[in-house]
Every structure is written in C-alpha cells, then in structure tokens.
A protein has these predicted regions:
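Short, solvent-exposed loop/turn segments at secondary-structure junctions
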Residues: 89-91, 129-131, 163, 189-191, ...
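N-terminal mitochondrial targeting presequence
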Residues: 1-55
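Active-site catalytic motif of lipid deacylating hydrolases and related acyltransferases
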Residues: 76-154
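A Trp-anchored, charged/polar loop motif used as the substrate-binding/catalytic surface
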Residues: 65-67, 222-241, 330, 334-344
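Short amphipathic alpha-helices and their capping/turn segments at secondary-structure boundaries
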Residues: 61-78
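C-terminal catalytic-base region of ester-bond hydrolases, centering on the histidine
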Residues: 244-345
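Serine-dependent carboxylesterase/thioesterase catalytic core
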Residues: 87, 135-241, 280
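Alpha-helical membrane-targeting segments
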Residues: 6, 195-227, 259-276, 301-307, ...
Length: 345
C-alpha cells in the first residue's frame, strides 16, 4: 500500500489552519472536506459531500493509479508521429553549469528512453522562456516545433505550465507549419493554482518583489506568475482558449501525502489541500483534469513526474520501512507513448 493511502489517504493528521482569504465563499469552510486521494485502485470516487458540486475540492479523482508504472515493461508500441516534450515553469531542456559539470536535463532519462523505442522515433525537447508569459512561451514552443519537426505532425507531452503554453499555441497562434495531433498534459494547472493566489496576494513567505528582482537580474521574465492564478486562468485564459476539434486532449494528475517538514513543497501542499483538495505539492488533481482524463497517480509528487525523485529518501524508506517505489517516471512516459500509438497517433 502506498504511503499516500496508508497515512490517512493524502490527508493531514491534524485539522488544517484556516486560510480565510483562500477558502471558497460558496459554502462555509467547516461544511466541506477536501476530496482526498483515497479508495481502491481503478474505482471512481464519489464526493463525500454534495452540497455544492461546483466546489473544486469535491471533484472526482477518476481512475487512481498506484503501481501500474512501477517498472518498465519489455515492450511498448511506438507512436507514428514525433513527440514534443514541453517543460513547465522555470524549466529548461538542458542546463549547463560549467564545462566540467555534466549538464542537467529537465526530462531526466525520459527523452532518451522515448528515443530508444522501436524505430527510434523523433523526440523534440522544446526550450521556452523559463518564467515568461504564456504568450511568449507558446510562441517559442511553436518556433521550436516548426524548426525541428520540419512539417511532420506531432504529439505534445507537456508537464505543468507547459500544457498551458501548448493550449495557447494550438488555439491562438496556429502556426501554419505546425500540425499537432494530440496534447497530453501532466499536472498542468488548467484551472489555476490556489498557491499562486497565495503568493500574488502577498501572504506567502516569499516576497514577490524580491523574487522578481532576483529573476530579472538573471535576465528572465516574471509574467508567468500572475498568469497562474485561478482568477486569471478561469476568468481570462480558459474562456478565450477553446480546444481545437483537430487535436486530441488527454491529461493526468497526481497526489501525494503531506511532504516532510523541511520540504519546499510543504506549505504549497497544505494550501492546495485546504482549498482545492488532493494535489502533488504544486498542482491539484482537480486543476489537472482536461479533455480525456486518464487518471490520478497516487503518492507521486510534482517533481517525481519528471524523474527528479529523491533517491536518498527512497533508499531510506526501503532499508528502514521495507517500502519500494511504486512509480517510475520513465515507465510512465513510455506508457503514454504506447497509449498514443494505440490511438493511432
């Protein structure tokens, strides 16, 4: 059983402190309980309360995936179209810190595994402005695809904010030399983030003015942060960014239990759980759902999704508690490729 399910199913052990500025005003906070990451694998979850079904914390988690991607299978089908990997906020394709330091890859081990599929399919790792606006990032995404796909149709797999970039490119920019057959989003905040609200409203421990100054001194933009709020995504972005009937849309979400005390995602997880329910530390399950929702990855964090798992943590868990990893990011993305192949994409 996963740690997420074993410890109260993605719930805090003690009642959370109220966040009056963030709790939805449609119903009293005391009358609602966030939908937790619980239940039996592959079962659809019925909300605990139905007083206000529009409350995001009460949405269905869909299929819960606990160990389907624990190991890499012997065979995966290969999609017929190239795959584009679109990174999230503050992401990169490859980061070099010096001539004597090995480069850091955002898609650690994932892009290489996809390229090793039968037929050696083309895999394009896009590189967009790390903290630029959705519009800026989408334009660069389109340019990267046009330059590297060279007229071939593509399937986009996007992590986090990368999914918003891809949606904007498909709906607004519509590059003549880019033909997108499918978009698979992984933990993309399609309905914004309560944690972004928290930061923008000046309630967080991080002072945005200081953060913006640091980012600008590094030569990067800061427009992305304000575009991840729930107000902007729900009020501006989604109404003006309709899906294309020529593109297949798929999505995955993830949830994890309360992060360790010193984890940088502990506060963001708490805020998201109180306001939106089950989440991966940065994006809620409710916000991740778009198009054909394929399921919720249980006991998987936002960084686990791109193979940035803490190997030391899992080694300790295995030695002291006998726990083994139930999620392998490489197996997950190979399965997405297999799914696309079976869909004829």
């Amino acid at each position: 059983m996963s740690a997420c399910l074993a410890r109260g199913l993605c719930r805090r052990r003690h009642p959370p402190r109220a966040l009056p500025a963030l709790v939805p005003t449609r119903a009293p906070a005391a009358s609602l309980r966030p939908l937790a990451c619980r239940g039996t694998r592959n079962l659809s979850i019925t909300p605990v309360l139905t007083k206000d079904d529009s409350d995001p914390r009460l949405r269905d988690l869909g299929k819960q995936i606990s160990d389907e991607f624990a190991v890499v299978r012997e065979h995966y089908d290969t999609p017929k179209n190239p795959i584009v990997l679109a990174h999230g906020l503050m992401g990169f394709a490859e980061l070099r810190l010096g001539s004597y330091v090995p480069p850091i890859h955002y898609w650690h081990g994932i892009s290489d595994a996809l390229r090793a599929l039968a037929g050696n399919p083309a895999v394009i790792t896009a590189a967009v402005p790390p903290s630029g606006s959705i519009e800026e990032r989408a334009a660069k995404l389109g340019a990267d695809i046009a330059a590297k796909a060279r007229g071939r149709s593509v399937n986009i797999i996007a992590h986090s904010m990368g999914g918003l970039d891809a949606r904007y490119m498909i709906s607004h920019l519509k590059p003549a030399d880019v033909d997108v057959k499918s978009l698979v989003t992984v933990a993309t905040p399609h309905r914004g983030s309560a944690f972004a609200d928290f930061l923008i409203n000046g309630q967080g421990p991080i002072k945005l003015a200081n953060l913006y100054g640091l980012i600008e001194r590094a030569g990067l933009g800061t427009k992305a942060f304000g575009q991840l709020t729930r107000e902007y995504i729900e009020g501006e972005f989604n109404p003006k960014t309709p899906d294309s009937d020529k593109v297949r849309y798929f999505s995955y979400g993830a949830c994890t239990s309360t992060p360790p005390l010193l984890s940088p995602f502990r506060q963001s997880h708490r805020i998201l759980e109180e306001v939106e329910g089950a989440n991966d530390g940065l994006v809620s399950v409710a916000s991740s759902q778009w198009g054909d929702y394929k399921g919720t990855l249980v006991d998987v964090s936002h960084l686990d999704l791109i193979n940035w798992s803490n190997r030391v943590r899992w080694t300790v868990r295995k030695v002291l508690m006998g726990q083994t990893r139930t999620f392998n990011a490489v197996a997950f993305y190979l399965d997405i490729a297999d799914m696309l192949a079976k869909e004829g994409l």
